[in-house]
């Protein structure tokens, strides 16, 4: 064999090996990307956003469906989040097909916008081990299981309460819940962002853990409904 011919064979062999290895690596990466994340969780965090305070924030001003004048909305469902016992729960656990219009129409009474419904399904619902239909049925059932005192949900004037006072009012309105089932979250300006209720996967109430979060301010403000 001529020297030049052997060199060409050697180069061709090396290139073939590189192509095969690259193809196998690409297939491996593609397979790993398609594998859903671990969706195990300890409990649900039912998050209820306080609309008047959300609507006073820059992001809320841009949302007329929730924040338009005359809407008279108090607490609305932000989401039902799978939660870890000692850490945040899983998110974005798999491919999220668009939520059907029939599910959206059943859920708009609870979650005020279609875009938020789609977002909650993609980010949190895919980690619930439920179909979209069953997940949003669970969202509605969870919300219906919780009573919000009228002086919190529809205050006629601005309220200032400590996080503990907000949680105590919720506990009093839901005597079958442990007092530790409630948490508050707040904006940096001191307005109430949301209340969080801890529920087992079967929706029975339970005590929250530190992973549920807690407002660290001494007082939170609730604006009157509009």
Predicted regions, residues:
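Hydrophobic alpha-helical segments
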Residues: 21-22, 36, 61, 93
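N-terminal secretory signal peptides that target proteins for export/translocation
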Residues: 1-5
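Boundary at the C-terminal end of the N-terminal hydrophobic targeting segment
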Residues: 24-28
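Aromatic-lined ligand-binding clefts that engage carbohydrates, nucleic acids, or primary amines
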Residues: 30-55, 62-66, 108
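Hydrophobic helical h-region of N-terminal Sec-dependent signal peptides
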Residues: 6, 10-20
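Domain-level detector of nuclease and nuclease-like folds
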Residues: 47, 59-226
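Sterically constrained small-residue positions within well-ordered secondary structures
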Residues: 17, 37, 186-188
């Amino acid at each position: 064999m001529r020297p030049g011919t052997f060199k060409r064979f050697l180069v061709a062999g090396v290139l073939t090996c590189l192509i095969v290895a690259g193809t196998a690596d690409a297939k491996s990466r593609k397979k790993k990307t398609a594998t859903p994340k671990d969706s195990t969780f300890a409990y649900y965090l039912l998050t209820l956003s306080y609309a008047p305070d959300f609507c006073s924030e820059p992001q809320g001003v841009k949302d007329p469906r929730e924040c338009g004048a005359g809407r008279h909305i108090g607490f609305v469902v932000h989401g039902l989040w799978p939660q870890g016992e000692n850490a945040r729960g899983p998110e974005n656990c798999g491919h999220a097909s668009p939520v059907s219009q029939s599910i959206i129409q059943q859920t708009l009474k609870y979650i005020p916008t279609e875009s938020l419904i789609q977002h909650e399904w993609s980010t949190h619902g895919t980690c619930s081990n439920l179909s979209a239909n069953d997940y949003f049925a669970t969202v509605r059932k969870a919300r219906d299981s919780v009573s919000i005192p009228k002086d919190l949900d529809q205050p006629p004037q601005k309220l200032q309460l400590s996080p503990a006072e907000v949680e105590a009012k919720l506990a009093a309105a839901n005597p079958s819940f442990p007092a530790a089932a409630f948490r508050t979250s707040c904006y940096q300006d001191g307005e109430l962002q949301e209340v969080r209720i801890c529920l087992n996967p079967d929706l029975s109430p339970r005590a929250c853990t530190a992973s549920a979060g807690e407002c660290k301010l001494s007082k939170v403000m609730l604006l009157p409904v509009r």
